[in-house]
Each structure stands twice: as C-alpha cells, then as structure tokens.
Amino acid sequence: MPKLKTRKAAAKRFRATGTGKIVRRKAFKNHLLEHKTTNKKRQFSKMAIVNERDEENVRLMLPYL
C-alpha cells in the first residue's frame, strides 16, 4: 500500500497540541486593522481550537499529525 500524502496547504495552517487537539489561527488579522479595536485585534491573535465537526476533515488531510 502506498504512503498517504499530506495536504501541504492544510499542514501550513493547522498544528496539534500536546493533548491531540488541532488548533488554527483566527481570521480578520491580516489587513484593514486601523478601525479594529485593540481588544479585538488581541482576540484575533490567539489560537482557536478546530471544531469537532471540522476536525474529522482536517485529520484526513493530515494523516501524520
């Protein structure tokens, strides 16, 4: 059986925590930041845990995560 391939686009966007959860970056933090409050920008800087419904698809894209 051939080796499973990793989706490289997904590999750049997701990481696994020590407990096995998958984390991602939040959106809305790349540009047009002038009108956003400091509090909102700080919240967007934090990592978010991938929803359990989406986690199944992410794990299929990253077989060696």
Swiss-Prot record:
This is Large ribosomal subunit protein bL35. The keyword Transferase does not apply. Keywords: Ribonucleoprotein, Ribosomal protein. The lineage of its organism: Bacteria, Bacillati, Cyanobacteriota, Cyanophyceae, Nostocales. One of its GO terms (biological process) is translation. The keyword Cell cycle does not apply. Gene3D superfamilies: 4.10.410.60. GO terms for cellular component: cytosolic large ribosomal subunit. It comes from Nostoc sp. (strain PCC 7120 / SAG 25.82 / UTEX 2576). PANTHER family: 54S RIBOSOMAL PROTEIN BL35M, LARGE RIBOSOMAL SUBUNIT PROTEIN BL35M. It comes from the Bacteria. Belongs to the bacterial ribosomal protein bL35 family. One of its GO terms (molecular function) is structural constituent of ribosome. The gene is rpmI.
